[in-house]
Swiss-Prot record:
Name of the gene: APOBR
Subcellular location: Cell membrane
Distribution of this protein across tissues and organs: Expressed in peripheral blood leukocytes > bone marrow = spleen > lymph node, and only faintly visible in appendix and thymus. Expressed in the brain, heart, kidney, liver, lung, pancreas, and placenta. Expressed primarily by reticuloendothelial cells: monocytes, macrophages, and endothelial cells. Expressed in atherosclerotic lesion foam cells.
Annotated Basic residues bias: 1000-1017
This protein's name: Apolipoprotein B receptor
Signals that turn on the gene: Suppressed significantly by PPARA and PPARG in THP-1 and blood-borne monocyte-macrophages. Decreased after pitavastatin treatment in peripheral blood macrophages and remnant lipoprotein (RLP)-induced foam cell formation.
Organism, scientific name: Homo sapiens (Human)
Length: 1097
């Protein structure tokens, strides 16, 4: 449906334009499975344009008749949801709420609600100030339409039904329209200019998307619009209410509604589909539908700001719209956050205004309310979507909506957050954000919002920008989610950009120490996010858009989530839904953890710790405790540094963060996805902890290198090498990760589920094993991604642990550049073993153990072994499990053993080998991967076993297998001294070459022999044929080692034809039972011999 919506907008507009005068026909067509939301939006555009002149009013009325009919059914279906709002705007509100609730009830209602939005948009345009209820209604419609966007895809039938209902509702809508006109007159008295102004300002300013706080500068219609567009995303209604119900606001609302509907609307309701769909529709339909909706929202906001209906429409309808319009939009979410914050659920009108006041605070809080509000609103919208994603893609909004208590649920969550979030001035923002975020991540996003406000108010301007950029990225990410290959390209581009953004982002990771925590903990999410990415990552990304500035790492993780979704999503779109759901839960818990840590770092944690901890505990009890300890330690140390660094670096790296976010999104999340439990957490766990974690999360590893270097004893070397390496790695990572992502995501997704459990657990459990598990989870493909992440981490950790020092960074950097994957990993691993090992192990196991199940290295190792065990179990390699257990014995031993056991596991052959097995060598790095792919899993295991031995002998060998990793390992060896010597000593595993080559030869010979033997055995007598066909089959199908052996045997047999009977014929016959075996010069003779032989016998 997304593509249909993408492509149907023209059809929708054309149909809608034709149907403008045919309300029933409109409802009929809108009832079609064709995405009606776009039609509605387009019709809303057309009808709205017509409606601008009261001439369109007739059409509007017709459309409203349809909408009313729709509402009639929606009133029925959505009546339960409508209850709150019906009371408030019972006449118009009922239908509008019905629409809102209706589309909550069904996408048919939603789409029709959107059609209603069209009609309502038209009506609202014509009767822009007629009735704020109508505006809210239309706005709800628009938002409902947004929700409908996602619903309608699945509920086209319901749409058809609701078309009929829509007819009734449109009839009602006419009455409402009239009432709205009356109220519009009343509203126009203060805001008549709003009516006309809002109509075309609405249109003209639809273009002024970005803007200041909009509603605050109500006079600055376009500025407001721009700001409100975003602010309206969260504040549309509030800004409208604040904006004194001005047409400007309407304009703002329009654009804000675009963003709101794109963000707020589909954040809450349209979330999964609608984010992408609404993003597209927004782009497509934004002019019409979003305009109509924005107008409706704007009118609502205007009227609300007008204050006549501001309390009533805003309070009653908006609370309703908050209930349905929270869904209806982040504006509702924002207002609702404000409402829930100010009036919580009960004071919907007062709370709307309170929310507007809160929203004013929010809007006024540094535009912090507005920006943070916008961001929060977007976060809300996105996080509502995320929440809905939590509940199931749409369910968050739908669930709330179905509950008829969207705003109530959000309020409740927000109330919790309110309890959690002490600052109410911010809390309106936080609550609005949190409310939606609560929906999305219940408490986690709220903490983000709070932490975001704490750290983010400083950055809220940036947060707004970043939130907008993040949202824009989300739009792109959502759309790219739809077109994930695009995002893969974007991710690559972002990674390339990341090369340039890395240093700033490295700085961000510094401020992102706490962010790193978020990223690291968001990292477990990252995998789910990679799956959830479009939804939750966007939601988290939006929440991180607000918090993204704050939570550079979190934004990275969120954005990363987006990136992997772009990448991994494109790669594994099927898994994403499942993993997204699971990942959503994990995302909530993990985000809760990460946000919690971040907020702790921001010192907001204590407030939220209680709330976050349950979520985190739910998601990962051990991780929670460990993170709590880790966060306490980090929070103490990094809290101050993170706050200051975050603000400074976020400010400095504001744009860079965005770029890095977009970049780090994809790259980091990929690394994070596999690294989610691994690199991110491990990086966290590793020396620099959050900084590294975020750095790796942000830059994956390059930033980690620099951040780690910053945090590490050798910041200069670390940074220099890390950044040099980052640039190089950026390229290498882009190159490798593009491939690795695709492979690793494809390979790693199934594994990632396992690895996510294992890696999240193991990532929680231990940093080193976690990266290994991550690699295991993601496979070497991810290992390539993680490799540098680990490399960078280890560079960080090397930087953190001066053991690696600048040399390791440089060597690792260059080696990573060369190897980028395994070589760097080997280097990093050697760093672990070597000097860096001490620092890394100490930092990693201390922080890692903290992050991991145990604070003690043994605990982290045990956790690692356990997590790896899960990974190994997933891999089905108990050997590696044993090695994982042995891993606790010693990293070098583990390394070697793992190397021996997991041929792919330069770092953790353990986890990787299982992944390799899982991927059947897909994850096998470089030649191994191709080789493993060529080689069957069996032979892969053989090869692996054989390779593992050489790998055991020399991870550097494994690295050389990967290509130049031997050089890397050797370079590392020279850098690290004898550390790499043992690795590079052993030659490349000849067994691999032997195994693989014989296999290929066997295949060739088999195919030829079979080809020749088939006609032969066909000629052969039935009994011989019977004997022979099995042999041909095994060569063809089994390609079994026995076949290879017989081939080898037979070939030797050819030289000695006398071998059997001493007679050439028997020699030709050789073993009749073998079939013809390999094609050989004597095949014909052998065949003839066999044919002639059986006759005597």
């Amino acid at each position: 449906m997304d593509f249909l919506r993408l492509y149907l907008p023209g059809l929708h507009q054309a149909l809608r334009g034709a149907l403008d005068s045919l309300g029933t026909f409109v409802s009929y067509l809108l009832g079609d499975a064709v995405p009606t939301v776009e039609r509605e939006a387009q019709a809303a555009e057309e009808l709205g344009v017509v409606a601008v002149g009261k001439t369109g009013k007739i059409v509007e009325e017709e459309a409203q008749e349809d909408l009313e009919g729709l509402r009639g059914s929606q009133n029925e279906g959505a009546g339960r949801l409508r209850g709150p709002g019906d009371d408030r705007r019972h006449e118009v509100g009922s239908s509008a709420v019905e629409q809102t609730w209706g589309w909550g009830d069904g996408s048919s209602h939603g789409s029709q609600a959107e059609r209603q939005d069209s009609g309502a948009g038209e009506t609202a345009k014509a009767a822009r100030c007629q009735e704020p209820s109508a505006h809210l209604e239309a706005r709800k419609k628009s938002k409902a339409g947004s929700g409908a966007c996602q619903d309608r895809s699945g509920q086209a039938q319901e749409r058809q039904e609701s078309h009929e209902q829509e007819v009734n509702r449109e009839e009602r809508l006419r009455s409402w329209e009239q009432e709205e006109e009356e109220e519009e007159v009343r509203a126009r008295e203060p805001g008549m200019a709003r009516g006309a102004e809002s109509e075309w300002t609405w249109h003209g300013e639809t273009e002024g998307k970005a803007g200041a706080v909009g509603p605050k500068a109500a006079g600055d219609n376009r500025e407001m619009e721009q700001g409100v567009r975003e602010a309206d995303a969260g504040e549309t209604e509030e800004p409208g209410a604040e904006g004194a119900g001005k047409g400007e606001e309407v304009v703002v609302v329009e654009k804000a509604c675009e963003s709101t509907r794109a963000w707020g609307t589909w954040g809450p309701g349209a979330e999964p589909e609608d984010w992408g769909i609404l993003g597209r529709e927004e782009a497509r339909t934004t002019p019409g539908r979003e305009e109509a909706r924005a107008i409706l929202d704007g009118e609502e906001a205007r009227t609300i700001s007008g204050g006549e209906e501001a309390e009533t429409a805003s309070g009653g309808e908006e609370a309703e719209t908050a209930s349905g319009g929270e869904e209806a939009g982040t504006a509702s979410g924002g207002e609702e956050a404000g409402i829930a914050s100010g009036g919580e659920a009960g004071t919907a009108s007062g709370g709307e205004e309170a929310g507007t006041a809160s929203g004013g605070e929010e809007a006024g809080t540094a535009s912090g309310g507005d920006e943070a509000w916008t961001t929060s609103g977007k976060e809300e919208a996105d996080l509502l979507g995320v929440r809905q994603t939590e509940y199931g893609a749409v369910p968050g909004e739908r669930l709330l909506e179905a509950t008829g208590k969207v705003w109530v649920l959000e309020e409740e969550g927000d109330e919790e957050r309110e309890a959690e979030v002490s600052p109410f001035p911010k809390q309106p923002q936080v609550l609005g954000t949190e409310r939606t975020e609560e929906a999305a991540e219940s408490q986690t996003a709220g903490r983000e919002a709070v932490g975001g406000q704490e750290a983010g108010e400083s950055f809220e301007g940036q947060v707004d920008l970043r939130g907008k950029e993040a949202e824009m990225r989300q739009d792109l990410g959502i759309r790219a989610d739809r077109a994930r290959m695009e995002e893969l390209v974007q991710a690559e581009e972002a990674q390339e950009e990341r090369g340039s953004s890395r240093d700033p982002v490295a700085e961000l990771p510094s401020d992102g120490e706490a962010e790193g925590t978020a990223d690291l903990e968001a990292t477990p999410e990252a995998r789910p996010e990679e799956e959830l990415t479009g939804e939750e990552s966007e939601a988290a990304q939006t929440s991180c858009g607000l918090l993204g500035v704050e939570w550079g790492g979190l934004t990275h993780s969120v954005t990363k989530g987006q990136g992997p979704e772009l990448m991994g999503g494109a790669q594994t779109p099927t898994k994403q839904p499942e993993e997204r759901e699971a990942g959503e839960v994990e995302l909530m818990g993990v985000l809760a953890l990460s946000k919690e840590e971040q907020e702790r770092s921001l010192e907001a944690g204590p407030r939220h710790a209680g709330s976050v901890k349950p979520e985190a505990s739910e998601a990962f009890p051990g991780a929670w405790e460990n993170r709590t300890r880790k966060d306490m330690e980090r929070g103490n140390t990094q809290e101050d540094a993170a706050d200051g660094e975050q603000r400074e670096e976020e400010e400095t790296a504001g744009g860079q963060t965005l770029a890095a976010e977009a970049e780090g999104d994809r790259e980091s999340e990929l690394s994070e996805v596999p690294e989610a439990g691994g690199e991110g957490l491990t990086t966290q766990d590793a020396g620099c902890g959050t900084e590294e974690g975020e750095a790796s999360v942000s830059e994956n590893q390059e930033l980690d290198g620099s951040t780690g270097a910053d945090a590490g004893p050798c910041p200069s070397l670390g940074e220099a090498y890390a950044r040099e390496t980052e640039d190089e790695e950026a390229e290498a990572d882009r190159t490798s990760r593009r491939g690795w992502r695709l492979q690793a995501v494809a390979v790693g997704l199934p594994d990632r589920e396992d690895a996510q459990t294992g890696s999240v657990a193991a990532g929680i459990m231990g940093g080193d094993v976690v990266p290994h598990i991550s690699a295991a989870g993601a496979g070497e493909a991810l290992e390539g991604v993680l490799g540098q992440g680990w490399d960078s981490k280890e560079k960080e950790e090397a930087a953190a642990g001066e053991h690696a020092g600048g040399q390791e960074f440089g060597l690792e950097g260059s080696a990573e550049e060369e190897v980028t994957g395994r070589g760097s990993q080997v280097e990093a691993f050697e760093s672990r073993e070597g000097g860096p090992w001490g620092g890394r192990v100490e930092a990693e196991e201390s922080a890692g153990a903290e992050d991991s199940c145990g604070l003690d290295p043994a605990g982290s190792q045990t956790a690692r072994a356990e997590g790896m065990g899960a990974m190994v179990e997933a891999g089905g390699l108990l050997e590696k499990w044993t090695l994982l257990e042995e891993e606790a014995v010693g990293w070098q031993e583990r390394e070697q053993r793992e190397d021996s056991e997991g041929r792919c596991g330069d770092y953790h052959p353990e986890g990787e080998a299982p992944r390799l097995l899982d991927a059947e060598g897909l994850m096998v790095t470089g030649g191994r991967r191709a080789e493993a792919k060529e080689t069957e899993p069996e032979s892969l295991e053989h090869v692996r076993g054989q390779e593992e031995q050489p790998t055991h002998q020399a991870p550097a060998e494994a690295a050389p297998e990967s290509v130049g990793e031997a050089e890397t390992a050797e370079a590392m060896g020279s850098a690290r001294g004898g550390a790499a010597n043992s690795w590079s000593e052993a030659p490349l595993p000849g067994s691999l070459l032997d195994v693989s080559v014989p296999r290929s030869r066997v295949h060739l010979s088999r195919s030829s022999s079979q080809r020749r033997s088939r006609p032969s055995f066909r000629r052969t007598p039935a009994w011989e044929q019977q004997e022979e066909p099995p042999a041909p089959n095994p060569p063809e199908e089994e390609l079994s080692a026995p076949e290879q052996r017989p081939l080898q045997l037979e070939e030797p047999l050819e030289p000695s034809p006398l071998r059997h009977d001493g007679t050439p014929v028997p020699a030709r016959r050789r073993p009749l039972g073998h079939g013809f075996g390999l094609a050989h010069p004597g095949m014909m003779q052998e065949l003839q011999a066999r044919l002639g032989r059986p006759k005597p016998q």
